[in-house]
Regions:
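Residues at beta-strand starts and edge strands
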Residues: 1, 130-132, 182-186
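Short, Φ-rich (hydrophobic/aromatic) sequence segments
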Residues: 14-21, 78, 134-137, 186-198
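Catalytic micro-motifs at enzyme active sites that drive phosphoryl/nucleotidyl and oxygen chemistry
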Residues: 83-84, 122-124, 176-177
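Non-heme Fe(II)/2-oxoglutarate
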Residues: 1-84, 96
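Short, solvent-exposed loop/turn segments at secondary-structure junctions
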Residues: 9-10, 102-104, 118, 139-141, ...
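Catalytic core of Fe(II)/2-oxoglutarate
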Residues: 144-203
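Catalytic core of non-heme Fe(II) oxygenases with the double-stranded beta-helix
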Residues: 89-95, 101-162
Length: 203
């Protein structure tokens, strides 16, 4: 159901990614009244809006400039895992980041159990869709994914992990375990789908 691997990122790689996520803070979009942001647009929140396509054209080149090595690592890993070349596609938003700034509200924040259907908002309806997460930064108390596989289960995250799954089962971002000011939960988020006879990764 869920594949967990590791991209082999060292601390210098992680520090560079975090530096650039913060550097691009002008492109963070606050999604709720609580400190939850995305770096740019994504299909599941914005796929039916003109802003998704307009702003992605602006941000995609900046994402490549700042996270080229990360994209290459993800492409190589997923290509090997799936057994078919995976590409970026400029028609859609590139994979980008969930950013949660530590806040006491996340200790008891309501769950959002869901399945992944972002392709439907973009009119990409087919059976090749899958989702991935790359863990970039987590609180010292930990972070993870809750999911249903017969019963409720918990997958603990480690920095550098890449989590790959079909997205067709109930899952939920696990709540913050302990509030410590100044901590973040930052993950690269993306999806894979077949488009024009190629497997592409997008968000």
């Amino acid at each position: 159901m869920i594949h967990v691997g590791n991209l082999g990122l060292d601390q210098l790689d992680i520090d560079d990614i975090l530096f650039n996520v913060l550097k691009l803070s002008d492109y963070w979009i606050k999604r709720l009244e609580v400190p939850f942001y995305t770096l740019g647009r994504n299909a599941y929140m914005d796929g039916k809006t003109p802003e998704y396509f307009k702003e992605s054209k602006i941000l995609n080149p900046k994402l490549v400039d700042h996270f080229k090595d990360l994209y290459v690592n993800v492409q190589v890993y997923l290509t090997h895992l799936i057994g078919e070349q995976v590409y970026l596609n400029h028609e859609f938003a590139y994979p980008s980041f969930h950013i949660f700034e530590s806040d006491p509200v996340f200790l008891n924040y309501p769950s959002n159990w869901h399945k992944d259907y972002p392709y439907e908002t973009l009119g990409l309806k087919n059976d090749t869709s899958s989702s991935f997460t790359v863990v970039i930064d987590i609180p010292k108390s930990g972070a993870g994914l809750e999911y249903i596989d017969g019963e409720e289960k918990y997958l603990a995250y480690n920095v550098g992990d890449i989590i790959f799954h079909k997205g067709n089962f109930l899952h939920n971002i696990a709540r913050l375990k302990e509030y410590v000011a100044g901590e973040y939960r930052i993950t690269l988020q993306g999806h894979i789908i077949r488009h024009n006879d190629r497997l592409i990764m997008y968000w």
